[in-house]
Amino acid sequence: MNFLSHYSSPLGPMTLTSDGEALTGAWFDEKNRFVSTLANDAVEQELPIFTETGRWLDVYFSGREPEFMPKISFGEAGAFRRAVWELLRAIPYGETVTYGALAKQLANPRMSAQAVGGAVGRNPISIIVPCHRVVGANGSLTGFGGGIQRKLALLKLEGIDTAKFSIPKKGTAL
């Protein structure tokens, strides 16, 4: 069974999902391409994992790095996506990394930054699995499902100097 809850963030409302034990999704509502991943039987119910996730998000949005992590699950995701999402979890608070650097960390010489970008773009647990910390090699702020302005706001919240980044005129997840 799947469960859902809502969180009111300073950047807009978010939907949280769980399998009953772990967090399986967190995304901004109006960019919710993940809604199709919810089973028809998803029940809106407050669970301990949602309370814990809400506390984590409260700390995060206060401008501090949370000292705890809610339990998360990537469900039925394939090995490649899981590997990329685990790399995302290792990106330190207040730092960024490029798609190409993530590809190199996978230790597969045939892996491209574009393939990594595809997996990053399918990250179902926004902010907590920090896909917003990934930028283009040229400093472009591309590819955040919550929108580029939110990505910029999240980076600023973490104390990152965003002057070195550029916002694409058109492209992904604007």
Model feature map: region roles:
Residues 111-153, 162:
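Short glycine/serine-rich loop segments
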Residues 1-111, 157-174:
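Basic nucleic-acid-binding alpha-helical/helix-turn surface characteristic of O6-alkylguanine DNA
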